[in-house]
Design a protein with these regions (language model features):
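Alpha-helix N-cap and coil->helix boundary residues
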Residues: 6, 22, 80-84, 99, ...
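Short, glycine/proline-biased beta-turn/loop segments that scaffold the active-site neighborhood
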Residues: 81-95, 206-207
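Active-site SXXK
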Residues: 8-11, 25, 31, 57-85, ...
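Short, conserved catalytic-motif segment at the N-terminal edge
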Residues: 2-58, 78, 156-167, 218
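Short, surface-exposed loop or secondary-structure junction motifs
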Residues: 96-252
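Catalytic tyrosine of NAD(P)H-dependent dehydrogenase/reductases that use a Tyr as the general acid/base
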Residues: 56-59, 173-175
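Residues at or immediately flanking beta-strands
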Residues: 22-24, 84, 172, 213
Length: 252
C-alpha cells in the first residue's frame, strides 16, 4: 500500500507551483476507488471546491481515447494503421510530400509533419458563442478564412495554406490538433458509426465510466453533472481568465 500522504504533498506542491485553480486526481483498482485527491476550486469566484464528483472538460484527453479507438479497430482488422490518409480523404496532401506518405499511424503519433497551425483557434473563436471578448478572440475572428466548422475546411487549409512541412512523415514529432481532427474522422469511417458512439460502447461503458461524455456544447455535461462542473480557466498574456462558456470547435 502506498503512502497517500506523500502523494497528497507531491500533487499539492505541483498545483501550487503552477498556480492551478482546481485539480482532481484518482487511482482506480479492481475493487474501485483506491485514492482520491482534490485541490482548489471549480469556479472563478473561488467559492465552490473541487470534489470527487466534479466534471472537468475532456479537452485533449480525447486524443488518447481517439488513438485507443483506432487501435481497437486495427486489432479487429477494421483499420490499417499503415494506410495512407488519402485513402480516406482523397483531397488530403502535405506540401512537398507524396500524397500517400502520411498514414493513419503518423497522424496518431503526431509525426505526419504538420506544423503548428491556426485552425483549432479559429474554430474556437468562430463557433464558441458567448465567449468573453479578448484581444485573442478579436484577432482570431479577424484572421479566420472561414468558420473552420467542417473537416473538409481543415483538409483544404492544410493542402493550400503554403506552409512548409516539418519533415517527411515519420521523421519529426510535432503535436498536431489538425492531425487528430482528421484521425477522428478516419475512425468514424472505419467504425461505421460516429466516434462518440464507438467510444461510448467500447471504452466508457465497459469501464463503467457513466459520467464521461463527449459533448460539443457542454449542455449535456452540465445536466449530467448536476451543476458540479468546472468553469473554463485560461491564461492570456500572463493573466488568468475564467469563463462559463466552454469552447465549441465542431471538427475537433
Amino acid at each position: 500500500m502506498f503512502d497517500s500522504s506523500k502523494l497528497d504533498a507531491y500533487l499539492t506542491g505541483l498545483c501550487q507551483a503552477r498556480d492551478l485553480p482546481g485539480v482532481s486526481a484518482a487511482i482506480m483498482g479492481p475493487d474501485g476507488l483506491e485514492y482520491a485527491f482534490n485541490y482548489g476550486f471549480r469556479d472563478g469566484a473561488f467559492t465552490r471546491p473541487v470534489d470527487n464528483d466534479t466534471l472537468f472538460g475532456v479537452a485533449s484527453m480525447s486524443k488518447s481515447m481517439t488513438a485507443l479507438c483506432a487501435c481497437i479497430l486495427a486489432c479487429e482488422g477494421r483499420l490499417d494503421l499503415n494506410a495512407p490518409v488519402s485513402d480516406f480523404f482523397p483531397e488530403f496532401e502535405l506540401a512537398g510530400q507524396p500524397r500517400e506518405a502520411a498514414t493513419v499511424r503518423t497522424l496518431a503519433m503526431h509525426t505526419a509533419g504538420i506544423p503548428p497551425m491556426e485552425p483549432l483557434e479559429w474554430s474556437i473563436a468562430m463557433n464558441s458563442e458567448g465567449r468573453s471578448e479578448s484581444d485573442w478572440l478579436r484577432e482570431m475572428k479577424r484572421t479566420a478564412p472561414n468558420k473552420m466548422e467542417t473537416i473538409d475546411q481543415i483538409i483544404a487549409y492544410i493542402a493550400h495554406c503554403g506552409y512548409n512541412t516539418l519533415g517527411a512523415p515519420g521523421e519529426v514529432m510535432s503535436y498536431s490538433n489538425e492531425g487528430y481532427a482528421i484521425l477522428s474522422y478516419i475512425v468514424d469511417q472505419a467504425a461505421g458509426v460516429p466516434l462518440e458512439q464507438f467510444m461510448q460502447a467500447r471504452i466508457f461503458d465497459p469501464l463503467g465510466m457513466t459520467r464521461t461524455i463527449l459533448d460539443n456544447g457542454v449542455e449535456a455535461a452540465r445536466a449530467l453533472s448536476g451543476g458540479n462542473i468546472t468553469s473554463l480557466f485560461e491564461v492570456e498574456d500572463g493573466r488568468r481568465t475564467c469563463d462559463d462558456c466552454w469552447s465549441v470547435l465542431p471538427p475537433f
